[in-house]
């Protein structure tokens, strides 16, 4: 599961390695069925009529796997907001999902830092967000205002996305091509432009805010499946 401003493009290089490991020196017995969907409102998936958040998307993907594709169980992997969705899958749908793999810690229970080390991390995080949080505030509160300007501007969409990729990546000497090829960057951007989903993709932040943001419900329920 991808996030924002990601797409299925970020998984293209690994799909065949998982579905046909024997082609890469592995064993065919280790092969997986791999389902790589665009999130609702992103890319070539259907667009919701109003903003929905990661928890609702988790329910949609669980239905996709169990009812539509008729798997008895599955594993979920996600990064960025895809990790948020995977968390909710593990939280709400553990009867079907047997494990989740996340590469971004996007969810937590509504209790503050537990020790001095965590308090120091929280201070660093809060300071960083002063410079990094503008896009999220805009997309979580007034996404349509932004969208009216972006939908007619491929350059605007490219700039909005590239700035995030640059800021969030571990680059060598500030060179974005040390982490991504131009083809990969442009392919990801074109998914948003060609499918005309910059607007509905940005809604996920509005939906997440309405669902409670970064916090699980204050009921002390845990994700019990392997994580």
Model regions and ranges:
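Acidic, glycine-rich loop-and-strand cores that form catalytic or ligand-binding grooves
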Residues: 192
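P-loop NTPase catalytic cores that bind/hydrolyze ATP
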Residues: 154-157, 182-186
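Catalytic cores of eukaryotic secretory-pathway lumenal/extracellular enzymes that build
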Residues: 1-151, 156-158, 163-169, 177, ...
């Amino acid at each position: 599961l991808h996030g924002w401003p990601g797409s299925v493009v970020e998984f293209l290089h690994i799909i065949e390695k998982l579905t046909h490991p024997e082609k890469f020196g592995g064993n065919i017995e280790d092969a997986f069925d791999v389902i790589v969907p665009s999130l609702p409102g992103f890319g070539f998936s259907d667009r919701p009529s109003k903003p929905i958040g990661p928890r609702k998307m988790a329910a949609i993907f669980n239905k996709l796997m169990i009812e539509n594709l008729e798997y008895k169980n599955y594993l979920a992997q996600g990064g960025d907001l895809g990790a948020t969705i995977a968390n909710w899958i593990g939280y709400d749908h553990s009867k079907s999902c047997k494990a989740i793999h996340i590469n971004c810690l996007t969810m937590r229970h509504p209790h503050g830092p537990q020790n001095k080390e965590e308090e120091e991390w929280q201070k660093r995080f809060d300071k960083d967000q002063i410079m990094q949080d503008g896009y999220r505030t805009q997309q979580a509160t007034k996404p349509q205002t932004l969208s009216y300007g972006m939908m007619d501007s491929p350059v605007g969409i490219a700039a909005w996305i590239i700035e995030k990729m640059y800021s969030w990546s571990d680059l060598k000497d500030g060179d974005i091509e040390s982490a991504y090829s131009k083809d990969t960057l442009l392919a990801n951007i074109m998914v948003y432009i060609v499918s005309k989903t910059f607007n509905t993709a940005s809604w996920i932040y509005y939906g997440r805010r309405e669902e409670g943001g970064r916090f699980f419900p204050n009921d002390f329920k845990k994700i019990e499946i392997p994580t």
